[in-house]
Regions:
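Catalytic cores of Mg2+-dependent Asp-rich isoprenoid enzymes
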Residues: 1-55, 62, 67-184
């Protein structure tokens, strides 16, 4: 999909013609790996995975607007840009920063709703994977929030400080993060 980038007219166009193939199918695959808490919950687990895939991908788009444009890609829906007064995205144009901030905050709210949907059905997943999925929702949800509340616009690539990442884990799991770095 990135080999021949094209603009996406609406959020629905973006989700169905890009996000589905880049993130949602990964969530579906992982749902088969992780499993559901019971066979009857598998559909809910798939719905949660779909919501999480969309939320994660939207957050990544919001974080990387300037970098994506440098690579010839624009993942912000064209209709939202036009509604904010941007006819053609130019991430370097200081005159567009306010309008881009409006679009970013709007899409961040959309992503926030998808994170909430993913969290609502977290119990549909097998118990042994819920902690990892919950941590993912919380860390990326925090990144999404930082992007939405940033006064620096797209000139700064937001991230979540390590302390905030640790805060979403139970203390009994802290040792796993340094171990992951040591075993690379």
């Amino acid at each position: 999909r990135d080999t021949a980038p094209r603009p996406f007219e609406t959020l629905e166009d973006l989700i169905e013609n890009y996000v589905y193939g880049s993130a949602v199918v990964v969530g579906f695959f992982l749902t088969h790996v992780y499993g559901a808490s019971a066979p009857r919950d598998f559909g809910r687990a798939l719905a949660s995975a779909r919501a999480l895939g969309i939320a994660l991908q939207l957050t990544n788009f919001l974080r990387d607007v300037a970098e994506d444009q440098r690579r010839g890609r624009v993942y912000l829906p064209q209709d939202m840009l036009r509604e904010a007064g941007v006819e053609e995205l130019n991430a370097r144009d200081a005159g567009q920063q306010h309008a881009l901030g409006l679009v970013l905050r709007r899409l961040a709210r959309v992503a926030e709703n998808y994170y909430a949907g993913a969290l609502a059905d977290l119990d549909a997943f097998s118990p042994d994977c819920r902690l990892a999925i919950h941590a993912c929702i919380k860390v990326y949800g925090r990144l999404n929030e930082r992007i939405a509340n940033s006064s620096r616009g797209i000139s700064h690539r937001e991230s979540v400080p390590l302390g905030e990442k640790f805060a979403v884990l139970p203390p009994s799991k802290y040792w796993r993060i340094p171990l992951a770095y040591l075993t690379r």
